[in-house]
Amino acid sequence: MGRNYKWLDKDMLTPRQLKLFNYLKEYKKENNYMPTYKDMMKYMNIKSSHGIHQMLGYIEWKGYIKKYPAMARAIEILKEVA
């Protein structure tokens, strides 16, 4: 049996990626700015900022968001989940 590489499917988000993506949208809607990595870590119950960084990287690679690394909380939603 082969491995399941759903996280590499460029057309869809994994359940955890979708959970983070929806959190970003709701947080932005309620606060008019994006959450910090610490906020995301708490929401996703992840102990390391590297886990959030990696998950955001895959969501960006799939074309749902754009990160602007030189600015704090600079994440732009590019498209909605179908």
Question: Can you name each region flagged by the protein language model?
Answer:
Residues 60-68:
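A short, conserved structural fragment
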Residues 1-12:
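Short, Lys/Arg-enriched N-terminal segment that forms or immediately precedes the first helix
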Residues 14-17, 31, 70-82:
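Short, cationic-aromatic polyanion-contact patches
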Residues 20, 51-52:
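Helix-turn-helix DNA-binding helix
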Residues 19-26:
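Pre-recognition alpha-helix immediately N-terminal to the DNA-recognition helix
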Residues 56-57:
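Short, hydrophobic-biased segments on the C-terminal half of alpha helices
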Residues 35-46:
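A short alpha-helical element within helix-turn-helix/winged-helix DNA-binding domains
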Residues 26-32:
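Short helix-capping/hinge SLiMs at alpha-helix to coil transitions
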